[in-house]
Amino acid sequence: MAISHILICRTDNIGDVVLTLPLTAYIKQHFPEIKISFLCRAYAAPVVRYCTTVDAVIEMESLSDPAAFFAQSDIDTVIFAQLDKRLAVAAYKARVPVRIGNAYRTWFNWWYCNRPVHFTRGGSDSHEAQLNFKYLRPLGIRHVPKLAEIPAMYHFKIPHEAALDQMLQPYRFNLIFHPKSNGHGREWPSDYFVQLARSLVRQPDIHVWVTGSAAEGQWLAEHASELLQLPNVSNVCGQLTLAQLACFINAADGLIASGTGPLHMSAAFGQRTIGLFPTARSMHPGRWGALGRRAQSLSQTVNCAGCKIKHAMTCECMRSITPEQVEKIVLEWLDQKRNQQQISGSA
């Protein structure tokens, strides 16, 4: 059967969504004329719309009747890149010809998906972005790219927003701190962000912007107030939509975060990015590291009892990544930008 319209469903967090987007570029390489739609939650949709290898974005919240949506569409292939029984049942009822889902330990995908794949995420040594490529096997695509290949599969067209550009314009190097993770991963200690920002006061060219939700901004005000009071720091927590945050990250000069959605956005956009990770198997950079042409991940191998505590905010292996290590990379970034400006100025 000739495939003409694929829908990829990923309705969880923004980081997971970003790590699924390389599939769209790889499918386009093999089937250039194919239409690719992407179904995600409304809050993640603005970032997916900036991806040029996605032809249409459907917001999960807009589907009051998923079965009717599938029946009325021309979608002939659906990839459930995340377990979702409601959508799997709907595609089955609508008789979508090709329904791909992971049937490993999942009875409803055995029943409702007629092109099942079988793999485990938790026990795998592969990166999350690589695991997603296993969904392409029923399409005849068995290649799983090396990590070094994936950054080239990100294609974004992110607009400039004049108000945001104006905020950044007075400073030569705009560095984003995204200290919190919305409870989705281990965090670098907030006092380390304070130490790093305090040390960067000595670099007049660098200005720090703290991003996050309004609730995260409130947490920082209560637990890391010194960070928000430093003269080289501006707090924009709760002031940006996700679409604006994407524009802000793209227009800045670098970002530092733990394994959270904005980290993966920054890396995918090609921004200078530092990801800070624990060593626990389910959270380490081999599984969730930042993937981008200017991204790098830091992690320290230590005997960390805190890694075994499921919902710990931080742990000893995160504390073993020092502010001095991170600052060294930031200063290298600053030198790189200065050199680039000198080269373009003399050209």
Regions found by a protein language model. Name each.
Residues 1-347:
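Catalytic machinery of carbohydrate-active enzymes
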